[in-house]
Swiss-Prot record:
Gene Ontology molecular function: proton-transporting ATP synthase activity, rotational mechanism
Record's bilayer topology term: Single-pass membrane protein
Keywords noted in UniProt: ATP synthesis, Cell inner membrane, Cell membrane, CF(0), Hydrogen ion transport, Ion transport, Membrane, Transmembrane, Transmembrane helix, Transport
Entry-linked InterPro entries: ATP_synth_b/b'su_bac/chlpt (IPR002146), ATP_synth_F0_bsu_bac (IPR005864), ATP_synthase_B_chain (IPR050059)
Function description: F(1)F(0) ATP synthase produces ATP from ADP in the presence of a proton or sodium gradient. F-type ATPases consist of two structural domains, F(1) containing the extramembraneous catalytic core and F(0) containing the membrane proton channel, linked together by a central stalk and a peripheral stalk. During catalysis, ATP synthesis in the catalytic domain of F(1) is coupled via a rotary mechanism of the central stalk subunits to proton translocation. Component of the F(0) channel, it forms part of the peripheral stalk, linking F(1) to F(0).
Any Gene Ontology CC annotation: proton-transporting ATP synthase complex
Transmembrane parts of this sequence: 5-25
Domain of life, per lineage: Bacteria
Protein name, as recorded: ATP synthase subunit b
Compartment(s) of residence: Cell inner membrane
Family to which the UniProt record says this protein belongs: Belongs to the ATPase B chain family.
Quaternary state and interactors: F-type ATPases have 2 components, F(1) - the catalytic core - and F(0) - the membrane proton channel. F(1) has five subunits: alpha(3), beta(3), gamma(1), delta(1), epsilon(1). F(0) has three main subunits: a(1), b(2) and c(10-14). The alpha and beta chains form an alternating ring which encloses part of the gamma chain. F(1) is attached to F(0) by a central stalk formed by the gamma and epsilon chains, while a peripheral stalk is formed by the delta and b chains.
């Protein structure tokens, strides 16, 4: 420590002496004047070192510690920020994967529902066709029955007409009486 102080003192003296040498010439007493200035300067340096040495040293030591602490805290903050960034990026990747999974699932469900709707529509189509076929068969049967009934009525009318033309009123009365007897016989 003392070696550093001596070195600093010597540098200051050399700087001061070169500054004094650059001045204009004075008459007489040059060495005394120079020695007095050097002694004054040495006393000033001694007082500064004696009274302000420790506070200045402490100030710079504290400043150094503060800077080192700030650097450490900055590095820690940077590491935490990088870690947080990595976590966020990982979460985003997971979210992207989740979104893709949801889209894939929705697409699969949509395809399944489409297939199910097509199958149900095919079943409904077959059911409607079967119902239509049954209705057509029923309508055809009803039409046939109606035609048979009408044909029977026409046949009866034609038969009746032919019978009326061929049968005399006495024969009609006789047939009527026989029919009444047959009907009465069935009732009993």
């Amino acid at each position: 420590m003392k070696g550093k102080m001596l070195l600093i003192f010597m540098m200051i003296v050399m700087i001061a002496s070169s500054a004094m040498a650059a001045e204009a010439e004075h008459a007489g007493g040059d060495l005394k004047d120079w020695a007095f200035k050097v002694i004054n300067f040495a006393i000033l340096v001694f007082i500064i070192v004696k009274f302000l040495g420790k506070p200045i040293k402490n100030y710079f030591a504290q400043r150094k510690e503060l800077i080192e602490k700030s650097i450490r805290e900055s590095q820690e903050a940077k590491e935490l920020a990088q870690k947080a960034l990595q976590e966020v990026e990982e979460k985003l990747k997971l979210k992207d994967k989740e979104v893709q999974d949801i889209l894939d699932t929705a697409k699969k469900i949509g395809e399944q529902e489409k297939i199910q709707i097509v199958q149900e529509s095919e079943k409904l189509k077959e059911k409607i066709l079967e119902q239509a076929k049954t209705n057509i068969e029923f309508e055809v049967k009803m039409a046939k029955d109606a035609l048979r009934l009408e044909a029977a009525e026409l046949a009866i009318q034609l038969s009746e007409q032919k019978l009326k033309e061929k049968i005399t009123p006495e024969e009609q009365e006789k047939l009527l009486q026989e029919s009444i007897k047959i009907i009465e016989g069935r009732k009993n």
